[in-house]
Amino acid sequence: GWYGFNVGSALAAVDVDLAAIAVTTTLSAAAGSITAMYTSMISGKPNVGMTLNGALAGLVGITAGCANVNNLGAVLIGLVSGALVVYSINFLEKKGFDDAVGAVSVHGICGIWGVLAVAIFDTSDGLFYGGGGTLFGPQLIGILAIGAWAYATSYLVFKVIDSTVGLRVTAEEEIAGLDASEHGTSAYGDFITKK
């Protein structure tokens, strides 16, 4: 999974410590899961789903800078990612967003944080390493470019899907559960809503 992604992506680079990339990836995921677990306790008890999303958030957060941050930077990126994912999921849920798995929070919010974190923790030019904030501009431009591209292509694809086969299921299918309506079985019986 993510080790192939982060470490494998660095194989094309010259003079990169692949083991260090694996370590920063692991540290950020661990810090993200621990922070998400403790942050999710604001609801009274630790939430396993949030803890797992915290690990993913740590992985997403470290991806942009996995080869350019040290271990402390990786832990700090993971800590922030873990808290961000919990607060973001809760916020979007309260606002009525339909994001059952927290994908916007994990990949969108924590991805933005990870790109900005490079400007802070990059050991060559990051804010904490004498860069004076010079990386913030390029990182922000990258975020805006990626966001514009993702929005435009997603909008186009979703419009095509909606105008052909439809983007939403019926209310009845949603209440019954997509596993039941599409496959005739229930994968997550504990999550069935009874009327």
How would you label these PLM feature ranges?
Residues 1-195:
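Glycine- and aromatic-enriched membrane alpha-helices
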